[in-house]
């Protein structure tokens, strides 16, 4: 009996273990089975995320596109109106209500036409693809091909243009810009009174940016009477033409007059090109018919009188004079005469170039006129050099209107006071100018000028002279961009003479506009101020990437996080500095670092600070800025992998 109970107990234990094992296996199978739903949930979430990226939202009737959903959205649409905008752009905000009205109108079109907007600051791929360089930029997409819209930003005009493009039989108008090759170049250029030619490379970013503006200008100028043609040359294919005209960069633009080339120095957008070429199409020199005109120039003029005296339009010297005038027409007013009466008054024979200063700028220390013999064999470049050399009086009047064209040469000695050549104040103005003349005659290597203290109030303030208490102040601006102020004292010729001599001997300390030097400057991006520019940027032992910015600049604000990331990326390199400078609050103490817009970025290589490399053409993102640094960094700052 006991034995039977024992066996029953053993059997019961065995069954219990079997049941436990089976239960564990079922649990394991359940767990295994349950893994698939979890994975499926993950896949579903990923699919949902992908769908979210591709989802197109609508805001007030306008579709919102980005880099991810753009292609899917436009794939099945014949016509789409696109606006590229920036969230901070004032013009974009102003245009938004009008754009929503356009969307509403085109939605009711038969068939409906989609209207979309793209934040170009975040959709960088699309902005690059469509060459967006300003905001807002409007384009019409026709069967996947972008059509530039350059009309007014009004509902009426935009809707009309979109409906025109949406027609089934619409095709893009033929290109107005002429395409030149070695086969047709000379024939076209030699027969044109004036023509603008662009030498470009298909891969060049600046050329791509210029292309739509250039074509718009070509269309506008083709409507003139007579029309002014614009042409282009692919310099990578037409290498002989590129070599013939010394094309070394892209795009290179040249003006041709009956085959003679002249540099194009104008703007690179539609209206700038149009205005510049219209001005260039006129005669470079104006004919003077009477002696009275010459006398009025001398009595009441405000600038150098440039007068060519010739026998007639067939005079070979006259043709050379015209060529020279064309090269300088933006900076000077040229005149010519065929009058023997005027020649007699000037006491010169025919075939002469005469330069004279108005009476108010004449002095006993300089000749009344400069005369050059001009014949058919005289080079236009020689005439040009002569004009530039003798265009300024010994002490001229520096004004905001002539500063860039007349007084860019350094060193420049400037005397500031109340300059007024009107009848009532001319005597006082000339009194101080005569004091300056007495010094200027002894320093022919320097340029001297007087300037009205009100016109240059900001400059006077930056020099620390606005509170000097003196009626007359003086300063010297040197070749490197440094400024030197004369200590406030009673002004006379002796004081000015002493000041200029001290500058010549290198005994003066420059005045530098500068924010306070940062106490803690160990961040990834070094802060440069006027007083530290030389110490940081011009350090000969270090490569420096310097960004010049303005606090109010939208593009600068957009760049800031990217630039900080760049600083962090290269922070470990001891011989490379990533830096920035508020160019509105600090002096740039070296004129090789020219800033004409914001942001401006330069790479200052170690050992060659006088030849900084400007960042141009690429996107201002981490990838392109890093590539720029790596391309130009010296061995000192290259990474170990590169070495």
Swiss-Prot record:
It is found in: Endoplasmic reticulum lumen; Melanosome. It catalyses: Catalyzes the rearrangement of -S-S- bonds in proteins. The keyword Repeat applies. Part of a large chaperone multiprotein complex comprising DNAJB11, HSP90B1, HSPA5, HYOU, PDIA2, PDIA4, PDIA6, PPIB, SDF2L1, UGGT1 and very small amounts of ERP29, but not, or at very low levels, CALR nor CANX. Component of a complex containing at least CRELD2, MANF, MATN3 and PDIA4. A motif (Prevents secretion from ER) lies at residues 640-643. Belongs to the protein disulfide isomerase family. Its EC number is 5.3.4.1. It comes from the Eukaryota. Keywords: Acetylation, Calcium, Disulfide bond, Endoplasmic reticulum, Glycoprotein, Isomerase, Redox-active center, Repeat, Signal. Residues 24-58 are annotated as: Disordered. Residues 1-20 form the signal peptide. Induction: Upon glucose starvation, as well as treatment with tunicamycin. InterPro entries: PDI_thioredoxin-like_dom, PDIA4_PDI_b, Prot_disulphide_isomerase, Protein_diS-isomerase_A4, Thioredoxin-like_sf, Thioredoxin_CS, Thioredoxin_domain. Residues 21-167, 167-299, 503-634 form the Thioredoxin domain. The modification N6-acetyllysine is found at residue 364. This is Protein disulfide-isomerase A4. One of its GO terms (cellular component) is endoplasmic reticulum chaperone complex. Disulfide bonds join 89-92, 204-207, 553-556. One of its GO terms (biological process) is protein folding. The lineage of its organism: Eukaryota, Metazoa, Chordata, Craniata, Vertebrata. A motif (CXXC) lies at residues 89-92, 553-556. O-glycosylated. NCBIfam families: ER_PDI_fam, pdi_dom. Residues 32-56 have a biased composition (Acidic residues). GO terms for molecular function: integrin binding; protein disulfide isomerase activity; protein-disulfide reductase activity.
């Amino acid at each position: 009996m006991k034995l039977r109970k024992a066996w029953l107990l053993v059997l019961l234990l065995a069954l219990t273990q079997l049941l436990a094992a089976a239960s564990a296996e079922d649990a394991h199978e359940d767990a295994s089975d349950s893994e698939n739903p979890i994975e499926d949930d993950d896949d579903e979430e990923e699919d949902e995320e992908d769908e979210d990226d591709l989802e197109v939202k609508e805001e007030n009737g306008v579709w919102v596109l980005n880099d991810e959903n753009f292609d899917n959205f436009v794939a099945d649409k014949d016509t789409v109106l696109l606006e590229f905008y920036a969230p901070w752009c004032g013009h974009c905000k102003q245009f938004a209500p009008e754009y929503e009205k356009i969307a509403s109108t085109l939605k009711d079109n038969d068939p409906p036409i989609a209207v979309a907007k793209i934040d170009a600051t975040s959709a960088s791929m699309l902005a690059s693809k469509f060459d967006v360089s300003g905001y807002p930029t409007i384009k019409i997409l026709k069967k996947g091909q972008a059509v530039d819209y350059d009309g007014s930003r009004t509902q009426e005009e935009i809707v009309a243009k979109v409906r025109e493009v949406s027609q089934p039989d619409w095709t893009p108008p033929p290109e107005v810009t002429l395409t030149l090759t070695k086969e047709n170049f000379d024939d076209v250029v030699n027969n044109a009174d004036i023509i603008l030619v662009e030498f470009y490379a298909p891969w060049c970013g600046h050329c791509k940016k210029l292309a739509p503006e250039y074509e718009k200008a070509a269309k506008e100028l083709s409507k003139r009477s007579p029309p002014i043609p614009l042409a282009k040359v692919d310099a990578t294919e037409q290498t002989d033409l590129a070599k013939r005209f010394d094309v070394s960069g892209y795009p290179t633009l040249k003006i041709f007059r009956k085959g003679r080339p002249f540099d194009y120095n104008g703007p690179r957008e539609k209206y700038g090109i149009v205005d510049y070429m219209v001005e260039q199409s006129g005669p470079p020199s104006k004919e003077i018919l009477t002696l009275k005109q010459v006398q009025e120039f001398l009595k009441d003029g405000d600038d150098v009188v440039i007068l060519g005296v010739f026998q007639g339009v067939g005079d070979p010297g006259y043709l050379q004079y015209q060529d020279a005038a064309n090269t300088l027409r933006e900076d000077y007013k040229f005149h010519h005469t065929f009058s023997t009466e005027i020649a007699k008054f000037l006491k010169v024979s025919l075939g002469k170039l005469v330069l004279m200063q108005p009476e108010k700028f004449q002095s006993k220390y300089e000749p009344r006129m400069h005369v050059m013999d001009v014949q058919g064999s005289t080079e236009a470049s020689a005439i040009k050099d002569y004009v530039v050399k003798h265009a300024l009086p010994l002490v001229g009047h520096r004004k905001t209107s002539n500063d860039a064209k007349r007084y860019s040469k350094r060193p420049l000695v400037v005397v500031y006071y109340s300059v007024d050549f009107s009848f009532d104040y001319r005597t006082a103005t000339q009194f101080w100018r005569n004091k300056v003349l007495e010094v200027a005659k002894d320093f022919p290597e320097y340029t001297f000028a007087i300037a009205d203290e009100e016109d240059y109030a900001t400059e006077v303030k930056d020099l620390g002279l606005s509170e000097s208490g003196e009626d007359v102040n003086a300063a010297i601006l040197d070749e490197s961009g440094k400024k030197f102020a004369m200590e406030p004292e009673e002004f006379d010729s002796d004081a000015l003479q002493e000041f200029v001599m001290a500058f010549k001997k290198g005994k003066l300390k420059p005045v530098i506009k500068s924010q306070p030097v940062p106490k803690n400057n160990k961040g990834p991006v070094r802060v440069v101020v006027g007083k530290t520019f030389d110490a940081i940027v011009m350090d000969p032992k270090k490569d420096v990437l310097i960004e010049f910015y303005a606090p109010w600049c939208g593009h600068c604000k957009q760049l800031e996080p990217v630039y900080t990331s760049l600083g962090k990326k290269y922070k470990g390199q001891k011989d490379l500095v990533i830096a920035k400078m508020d160019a509105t609050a600090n002096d740039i103490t070296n004129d090789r670092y020219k800033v004409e817009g914001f942001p401006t970025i330069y790479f200052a290589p170690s050992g060659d600070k006088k030849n900084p490399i400007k960042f141009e053409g690429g996107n201002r993102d981490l990838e392109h800025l890093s590539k720029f640094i790596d391309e130009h960094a010296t061995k000192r700052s290259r990474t170990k992998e590169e070495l």
